[in-house]
From Swiss-Prot:
This is Ribosome-binding factor A. It comes from Prochlorococcus marinus (strain AS9601). Gene3D superfamilies: 3.30.300.20. One of its GO terms (cellular component) is cytosol. It is found in: Cytoplasm. Belongs to the RbfA family. One of its GO terms (molecular function) is ribosomal small subunit binding.
């Protein structure tokens, strides 16, 4: 089993090269028309399986379609990756939508709503005391 340093190094290399493939080699208008970014790569300890989490400025429905398109094109992406990097075996890849950003934004929205509600409540209390 490779050490953490090797996992991080290979993950970083995969992220860099897959980003370049998405930007330059992949001929998919949906992916090119929306800002698609790789947010995280989970690489298995044996370097055989790779989960690639993507973020995009697109709406959730479009992001789902982008992920489907990427998973449809994963064999050609993997083939291009094999030409770019020297590895004994290029890992099997699967693309997933990274929903962490959406969850974070919804939490911030809830916090803002609570803050506004609390401020309105404090103003009403001050008015009632006057």
């Amino acid at each position: 089993m490779p050490n953490n340093y090797r996992l991080e190094k290979v993950s970083s290399l995969l992220k860099k090269e897959i980003t370049l493939i998405l930007q330059n080699d992949l001929e998919n208008d949906l992916i090119r028309d929306h800002f698609v970014n790789i947010s995280k790569i989970d690489l298995s300890g044996d370097l055989q399986h790779c989960k690639i989490y993507i973020t995009s400025t697109a709406q959730e429905k479009v992001r789902t379609e982008i992920v489907e398109n990427l998973n449809t094109a994963k064999s050609s992406i993997r083939h291009s990756l094999g030409k770019r990097i020297e590895m004994r075996r290029v890992p099997e890849i699967i693309f997933k939508d990274d929903v962490v950003l959406d969850k974070g934004l919804s939490v911030l929205k809830l916090l803002d709503e609570l803050k506004n509600k609390n401020q309105n409540h404090n103003v009403e209390d001050k008015d009632a005391k006057s």
